[in-house]
Amino acid sequence: MVRVAVSGAAGNIGSTAVEAFQNGKYDVTPITHREHEGMDSVVLNVEDRDAFVEALAGHDAVVHLAGRADPTASWEDVLRTNIEGTYSAFEAALVNDLDRLVFASSNHFHGMINIDESDRPETLTATPQAVYPDDPMRPDSYYGVSKITGEALGSYYADRHGLEVVNLRIGWFLTEAELEEKLSEPENVARFARAIWLSPRDCRRAVRRAVEASLPENPLSVNLTSDNESRYFSLARTINSLGYHSEDDSSSVV
């Protein structure tokens, strides 16, 4: 049985990722920064490398989702949790000789490409251009910068140490009810939500494939949204490299 650890397991995406591995094929270890009622988890601060090393002992892969998921976060906030914490995750994976690390990157890696208001990261122009994984980085926030740094770390650990790395550039993870609420916001925010929505069901499928799939290249960076009618992030590499198939579309919800 494959042993998978999931950091940030109490978050919205983290708890969904844990569900993805509760199918009898995996032994999943949730990692959280504090205790949560109803969840049996390993509790640690992701900046504590020694604790992270201990937590990953005996595992085959780690899905690293822990971090400050906020495009308004300060440099100090992302430096500690997103950058130092991600370094700890890679070091812990290396020390324990894990096969693979799946990194929760973000659409904010390319956030400035189609932004409608440069000081509001989650807005979308009325005529967005297609965005591909190999397009030059254009972060829209310190949060986006922290994800670029995480991917750079992944490139180093893949090339130098042979660790398999998958970077999932996640869209906007929302339940259907949350997506519907976004439509009451300004139109450029609603456009953004419709275009880059990632449903919980598609998230589970993608995270599982990121652990299971044979990689055509290492590291592998892919966009991750649902198959939305108005999406502008290309999913071609996600489909071809991971075998990801979305079943959801924001246009069928709103």
Task: Locate predicted features.
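Conserved beta-loop-beta element that borders a ligand/cofactor-binding pocket
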Residues: 105, 151-176
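Alpha-helical substrate-binding/gating segment
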Residues: 172-188, 196-219, 227
